[in-house]
From Swiss-Prot:
The chain crosses the membrane at residues 14-41, 45-69, 111-148, 169-214, 286-312. Keywords: Membrane, Metal-binding, Peroxisome, Peroxisome biogenesis, Protein transport, Transmembrane, Transmembrane helix, Transport, Ubl conjugation pathway, Zinc, Zinc-finger. It comes from Arabidopsis thaliana. Changing R170K: In apm4; reduced protein transport to peroxisome and repressed plant growth. Its main location: membrane. This is Peroxisome biogenesis protein 12. It is found in: Peroxisome membrane.
Length: 393
């Protein structure tokens, strides 16, 4: 069995399908992060972040609906040059061999398939994100209660399925009796918290199975939703792209012809339609380009801030000038390896730290102990300012 990774024919590769599937999630993460940064200076954006799921669902509803209506492909699929086609199996008979085989026939999408595609692309992910949020809240509540030793068991399975009606309120006024509505909401949240892990595991397992079968070229459907709708994703040919452009032009001309009212109202409506068409035409590339530019600017300013916040490293200062030799001091020998006191090669070299001159340890120790000064510069010194030097062999 061969892996389906090549780019031949109208069948998209596994990597094209995976990239198209992951694009909406990546786009949502980038938009959420961008809005979070802008909300630091524009407080009204916090209202959008409070309804993040609804905002993104409405945005994707517009983009997906427009893309399916004009290009027969989802928002992400149209970026990769992919199209959705209705797939029907037809039994093909071979009279010579007297056997039969199945042949897939592709045709344009029906209205029902477009509507259900929007449901699978927008509505179901929206409900899944809401269920995931409820599950996380209930899980955090249970962990918090277990940490503080609360009596409420959160979404414990045994507590739910045994039908125990004793519900402890998480509010400070826990002794008050909860209303029927609150009790029902609590039961629903418990039910979601118990069932969501199984729903999520089943969904991910089916998704992985279909993706593996698609990679192995064992099926033409990339997901269960596509098979349920009878839709296969194919590469768009050059002729299909031209037909799509002409179809979009016909749809827009028909919408302009349907305008009614006085001339000034038609002009306003036509201008609004032109603006909406321009926004929808450039929404795909413009949205992704805006996020890309924002991330580039963020990286640029972050690098500049790191450079400004980094400690300034100055070059090391030049060494101080050597102390001058006193006229009454002991002169230095021409050979620098000789001791100025005994005029012999230095044994156990030691330095006087106040001046930096090196002598034999025994010679300089006796001299400094007696005269309390450096032999060459006559700078006051003590035996505590004598340091022995050791050389690596």
């Amino acid at each position: 069995m061969l892996f389906q990774v090549g780019g031949e024919g109208t069948r998209p590769t596994f990597f094209e399908m995976a990239a198209a599937q992951q694009l909406p999630a990546s786009l949502r993460a980038a938009l959420t992060y961008s809005l979070g940064v802008f909300a630091l200076r524009r407080s009204f954006l916090h209202k959008i972040l409070d309804y993040e799921d609804e905002f993104f669902a409405a945005l994707m509803l517009i983009l997906e609906g427009h893309s399916l209506r004009t290009t027969d492909g989802s928002f992400a699929e149209s970026l990769y040059g992919l199209r959705r086609k209705s797939a029907r199996l037809r039994l093909r008979k071979d009279s010579a061999r007297k056997d039969s085989s199945e042949e897939v026939q592709h045709s344009g999408l029906e209205k029902r398939q477009r509507i259900l595609s929007v449901v699978f692309l927008v509505v179901l992910p929206y409900f899944k994100s809401k269920l995931h949020a409820i599950y996380n809240k209930e899980r955090e509540a249970r962990l918090r209660e277990s940490l503080w030793g609360a009596e409420d068991q959160g979404f414990d399975e045994a507590d739910f399925f045994t039908g125990d009606d004793s519900i402890v309120s998480r509010e400070p006024s826990g002794n008050e009796e909860l209303s029927v509505r609150v009790q029902l909401a609590t039961k629903i949240k418990k039910f979601i918290a118990v069932c969501y892990p199984w729903i999520h595991a089943s969904s991910e397992g089916l998704s992985f199975t279909y993706q593996l079968l698609y990679l192995l070229d064992a099926t033409g459907f990339y997901s269960l939703g596509l098979q349920a709708l009878g839709i296969q994703v194919c590469r768009a040919t050059g002729q299909e792209l031209m037909d799509t452009s002409s179809r979009i032009s016909k749809i827009r001309n028909h919408e302009r012809e349907r305008l009614r009212g006085p001339p000034w109202l038609k002009t306003v409506q036509g201008a609004l339609l032109s603006c909406s068409y321009a926004v929808l035409d450039y929404a795909q590339t413009g949205l992704i380009a805006a996020v890309f530019i924002f991330k580039m600017m963020e990286w640029w300013y972050q690098s500049a801030e790191e450079r400004l916040s980094a400690p300034t490293v100055y070059p090391p200062p030049p060494p101080p000038p050597a102390p001058k030799m006193a006229k009454e001091g002991i002169p230095l020998p021409p050979d620098r390896s000789l001791c100025a006191l005994c005029l012999q090669k230095r044994a156990n070299p030691s330095v006087v730290t106040v001046s930096g001159f090196v002598f034999c340890y025994s010679c300089v120790f006796k001299y400094v102990s007696k005269y309390k000064r450096c032999p060459v510069t006559l700078i006051p010194a003590s035996v505590d300012q004598i340091r022995r030097l050791f050389q690596d062999t």
